[in-house]
Amino acid sequence: MIPTALWRKLGGFDSRYFMYGEEADLCLRAAAMGYLPMITPDAQIMHLGGASAPKGVRMLQNWTSKATLVRGHWPRLLAPVGLSELWLSCATRALAAAMLGKLSGRSNANNDWRMMWEKPSRWHKT
C-alpha cells in the first residue's frame, strides 16, 4: 500500500518494467527520496481472471527487469559487476539445464535456458 500523494510524486510504475521488478523499482525510488518502504508479509492479492505467459517469455521478462534494475539503481561503477553476475548466473543455469537434459534423456529440458543463453542481448542489453 502506498499513499496516493507519494504514488504521484514517484510517477507510479516505470513503464520499462513489465510484470517483474516494478515494485522493486518503486521502492528503490521511494527510498532514494528518504522514504522507508516496508514489506507486509500478510498482505494478499487476488487476481480476478488473468492469464499467464509461457515460461520462456516470463523468464525473459524477469531477467530483462533484473538487468534494468541493475542499470538503473546500482552505482555506475558497479553496474557492470551486477550485469556480469546476471550473465554468469544465466550461463550456470543453462549449463546445468543442458546437463540435466542429457542425463534425463529429455532433449527439450533446457530450451528456455538455452534461449536465454543464446540470446543474451534480448535481456542483457549491454
Regions found by a protein language model. Name each.
Residues 1-44:
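A short, conserved alpha-helix in the catalytic core of glycosyltransferases
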Residues 10, 72-73:
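Alpha-helical structural context
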Residues 18, 32-35, 43-65:
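Nucleotide-sugar-dependent glycosyltransferase catalytic core
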Residues 34, 73-77:
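A general structural signal marking secondary-structure boundaries and capping sites
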Residues 57-65, 76-126:
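Non-catalytic, C-terminal membrane-associated alpha-helical segments of glycosyltransferases
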